[in-house]
């Protein structure tokens, strides 16, 4: 069984379509996308509402989860990074973890065949 990796990318909402398009051009169609909130170096933003100042310290982001074969890892991470980057604080993070197995529930397929 080939080694698989899970890529978890936290990116700006407005960059999601660019990242999805780049991944689809590479033949990567399967992904899970979730709305998340978080903070890092950006530390939130100040907003004014009806004359009152508020600090929003958990900012909305999008989380993508993608499982790929190890040989596709570098180019996939590169595509996400290039297409999610604005150059500003708050562009996000990419995490890579090992995947022991994947099982397609409908068919019982394992490993690469289940991705």
UniProtKB/Swiss-Prot annotation:
Keyword Ribonucleoprotein among record annotations: no
Gene Ontology BP term (one): regulation of nitrogen utilization
SMART domains found in the cross-reference section: P-II (SM00938)
UniProt cross-references to InterPro entries, sorted A to Z: N-reg_PII (IPR002187), N-reg_PII-like_a/b (IPR011322), N-reg_PII/ATP_PRibTrfase_C (IPR015867), N-reg_PII_CS (IPR017918)
Gene3D superfamilies associated with the record: 3.30.70.120
GO cellular component entries: cytosol
GO molecular function: ATP binding; enzyme regulator activity
Keywords recorded for this protein, A-Z: Nitrogen fixation, Nucleotide-binding, Phosphoprotein, Transcription, Transcription regulation
Sites bearing O-UMP-tyrosine, chain numbering: 54
Pfam families on file: P-II
PANTHER family registered for this protein in UniProt: NITROGEN REGULATORY PROTEIN P-II, NITROGEN REGULATORY PROTEIN P-II HOMOLOG
Role noted for this protein: Could be involved in the regulation of nitrogen fixation.
Family listed: Belongs to the P(II) protein family.
Name this protein carries in UniProt: Nitrogen regulatory protein P-II 1
The species this protein was found in: Methanothermobacter thermautotrophicus (strain ATCC 29096 / DSM 1053 / JCM 10044 / NBRC 100330 / Delta H)
Lineage, top ranks: Archaea, Methanobacteriati, Methanobacteriota, Methanomada group, Methanobacteria
């Amino acid at each position: 069984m080939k080694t698989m990796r899970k890529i978890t990318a936290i990116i700006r909402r407005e960059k999601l379509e660019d990242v999805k398009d780049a991944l689809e051009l590479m033949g990567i169609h399967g992904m899970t996308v979730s709305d998340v909130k978080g903070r890092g170096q950006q530390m939130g933003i100040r907003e004014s509402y009806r004359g009152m100042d508020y600090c929003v310290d958990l900012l909305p982001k999008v989380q993508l989860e993608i499982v790929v074969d190890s040989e596709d890892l570098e180019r996939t991470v590169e595509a996400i990074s290039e297409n999610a980057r604005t150059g500003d604080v708050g562009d996000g993070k990419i995490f890579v973890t090992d995947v022991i197995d994947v099982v397609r529930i409908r068919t019982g397929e394992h490993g690469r065949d289940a991705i």
